[in-house]
């Protein structure tokens, strides 16, 4: 009987040692999941960074388009003001007709004196 107990005790110690030496499949799964999570976080970070760069570029192009549209409008108004000035209208009458201030009309006329001559 003592031999059987000793044998079972030795077998149990051997099984415990064997179980510790085996690779735990859960650890492998956890490590793989951690790796996937880190790579996904890196991809999200890269995408967010690209999005901010693209948004900045888009905002810059919108500003350029707005400025060019404003310049086109300002040039049209300036041409109309100069045309009316050449036709003999006063600065006050031009300002009323174009819905701009008299100062703006005078500034446009002064800036374009070379064109008027």
Curated annotation (Swiss-Prot):
The chain crosses the membrane at residues 1-21. Keywords: Cell membrane, Coiled coil, Membrane, Transmembrane, Transmembrane helix. It is a single-pass membrane protein. Its main location: membrane. GO terms for cellular component: plasma membrane. Residues 38-67 form a coiled coil. The keyword Cell membrane applies. It is found in: Cell membrane. This is Uncharacterized protein YqzD. It comes from Bacillus subtilis (strain 168). The lineage of its organism: Bacteria, Bacillati, Bacillota, Bacilli, Bacillales.
């Amino acid at each position: 009987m003592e031999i059987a107990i000793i044998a079972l005790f030795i077998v149990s110690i051997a099984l415990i040692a064997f179980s510790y030496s085996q690779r735990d499949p859960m650890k492998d799964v956890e490590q793989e999941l951690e790796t996937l999570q880190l790579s996904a976080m890196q991809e999200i970070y890269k995408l967010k960074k690209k999005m901010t760069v693209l948004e900045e570029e888009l905002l810059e192009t919108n500003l350029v388009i707005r400025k060019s549209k404003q310049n086109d409008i300002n040039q049209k108004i300036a041409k109309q003001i100069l045309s009316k000035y050449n036709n003999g209208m006063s600065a006050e009458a031009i300002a009323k007709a174009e819905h701009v201030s008299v100062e703006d009309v005078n500034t446009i006329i002064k800036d374009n004196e070379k064109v008027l001559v």
